[in-house]
Amino acid sequence: MPFSDADLIARVLAREDHNAFGELVRRHQSPVRAFLARMARGDAHLADDLAQETFLKAWKKLHTFRGNARFSTWLFGIAFNEFRDFVRRRKELALEDADNLPNEPATARDGLLRLDLTEALKRLSSNERAAVVLCCQNGLSHEEVSQVLDCPLGTVKTNILRGKDKLRRLLAPAYKNYESAGN
C-alpha cells in the first residue's frame, strides 16, 4: 500500500528521507509543471526551471507545512510565488491584461480561423489565468485557489468568472469554424 502525502512528509521531517521526498516530487511534478507552463505562456524550459525551484524551496521549507490544506495546494502556492518572483525580476515577461489586447478573437492559419485553449489562456491576465488553471485544470476549490494565490475568495471568484467569460468570447469563433467544418 503506497504511503499518503502526509506519511511521506512525516518521513522527510523525521529523518530527511530523500526517497520519501523523491516520491512527493514524482507524484506532484506533472501538475506543477503543467501549471507553470500555462503561467509561462507555454515556455516549457521556463516551466521546468521554475518547477525545479519550486521543489527546492519545498524541500527547504517543508517544516513550515502545517497540513491545514492539501500538500498540492501548498505546492501550487510555492509555484505561483516562484512564477510571480520571476516576472518581477524579468519585466519583459510582465503579462498584459487581456483587456488591452486587440479584439481580434483568433489568428488565421491555413485559411481557417483558429484559437486553441493554450493561445486563449495567454490572453488572460496572469491572475485570471492562474485562477482558471488552478480551479479548472488542477481541480482546486475556490478556497484552495484563494490560499495558493494569497488573495480574498471574492477576488478568486471574480477572476475565474472574468477568465471564463474571456475564454468563451475568444474560443467561440474557433468553435463555430470547427463545427461548420463537420467535426
Model segments located where?
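Internal acidic/polar
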Residues: 2-7, 85, 91-119, 141, ...
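Short, charged helix-capping/linker segments at alpha-helix termini
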Residues: 13-23, 33-53, 176
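Short helix-capping/turn signature of helix-turn-helix
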Residues: 27-30, 38-40, 133-140
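Residues within the DNA-recognition helix of helix-turn-helix
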Residues: 28, 159-162, 166
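C-terminal edge and immediately downstream basic/flexible tail or linker adjoining helix-turn-helix-like DNA-binding
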Residues: 42, 147-148, 165-183
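Structural recognition of an alpha-helix C-terminal capping motif at a helix-to-coil junction
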Residues: 49-56, 69-81
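Arg/Lys-rich amphipathic alpha helix in sigma70-family domain 2
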Residues: 60-67, 77-97, 162
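Helix-turn-helix DNA-binding module
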Residues: 119-130, 138-155
